Regions:
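N-terminal amphipathic alpha-helix/helix-capping segment at the start of soluble metabolic enzymes
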Residues: 1-9, 13, 49-50, 239, ...
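A short, Lys/Arg-enriched amphipathic alpha-helix followed by its capping loop at the start of a domain
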Residues: 2-6, 18-25
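Hydrophobic faces of well-ordered beta-strands that scaffold small-molecule active sites
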Residues: 4-10, 27-29, 56-60, 92-94, ...
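Catalytic cores of alpha/beta
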Residues: 11-21, 68-81, 127-142, 163-178, ...
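Active-site beta->alpha loop and helix N-cap motifs at the rims of alpha/beta catalytic domains
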Residues: 13-15, 24-26, 38-39, 45-105
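Glycine-rich phosphate-binding active-site loops on the catalytic face of alpha/beta enzymes
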Residues: 26-38, 83-99, 144-159, 183, ...
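Alpha-helix-loop-beta-strand connector modules within alpha/beta enzyme cores
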Residues: 37-64, 103-125, 158-184, 219-243
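Hydrophobic, well-structured mid-protein blocks that either form specific transmembrane helices
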Residues: 85-142
Length: 244
């Protein structure tokens, strides 16, 4: 079994293809990352699944804003889970909270069961909960396969101490995946401080080296491939050093 997982969050097919070319273990496919992400369209989901050989996980979020959903919104989520499973996705990322901010275990468990055999990541709705320790137990009880979190902080580096506590609390019951403000410059520090084996990021940045037609610049896709390779290389180096 591989020592680590690097998941890239993308919202276009070229970015998804760049993720695979760069060595990402899987992608999370989203739309509207500018508002925190919502469920992408079926055409993009289908095209991405067909184009990639690595696992495609799909964000399920019907709207921006909070994660306490009405009955109609929850039914929409259920339908999206069912349809994405039909399309052949390997997994979904979702999160449902109660109006008081706690994890909605009943609805979450229902979605996990509906999604099977797809893998289910409980996403960063988790970071909105008032008690992260109890929320972790709720996510485990709901049957999720992975938890994506920044440790309740704006970014994974500032949440590193909490992430380490969560890794210890979770043990081998659920993988903790750090995501939120992940930067190449801080990846090694995050891994060292937390004991994590799974990282999630978008690694987005502007292609500033010049336009592709100049012959001196790189396209956004080429930059992303290079960044993913750097991220994967950093993780490989970290875990190789741990084995010495």
């Amino acid at each position: 079994m591989k020592a680590f997982i690097f998941e890239l969050c993308v919202e276009t097919l070229p970015a998804a293809q760049a993720a695979e070319l760069g060595g990402a273990d899987r992608i999370e496919l989203c739309d509207r990352l500018d508002i925190g992400g919502v469920t992408p369209g079926e055409k993009l989901i289908s095209a991405t699944i067909q184009a990639l050989s690595i696992p495609v996980h799909v964000l399920i979020r019907p709207r921006g804003g909070d994660f306490a959903y009405s009955a109609a919104e929850f039914e929409q989520i259920r339908l999206q889970v069912h349809r994405i499973k039909q399309l052949g996705a390997a997994g979904v990322a979702l999160g449902v909270l109660l109006t008081d901010g706690r994890v909605d275990e009943v609805r979450s468990r229902e979605l996990v069961e509906l999604a099977h055999p797809m893998k289910v990541t409980f996403h960063r709705a988790f970071d909105r909960t008032p008690d992260l320790s109890e929320a972790l137990e709720a996510v485990i009880r709901a049957g999720a396969d992975c938890l994506l979190t920044s440790g309740g902080e704006p970014n994974v580096l500032s949440g590193a101490k909490q992430l380490k506590r969560m890794v210890i609390q979770a043990g081998d019951r659920i993988p903790i995946m750090a995501g939120g403000g992940l930067r190449l410059a801080s990846m090694a520090e995050v891994l060292e401080q937390t004991g994590l084996h799974c990282l999630h990021g978008s690694l987005t940045r502007r292609a500033v080296d010049g336009p592709p037609e100049s012959g001196h610049g790189r396209t956004a896709a080429e930059i992303l491939v290079a960044d993913v390779r750097t991220a994967v290389g950093l993780m490989q180096g970290h875990f190789a050093a741990k084995m010495i």
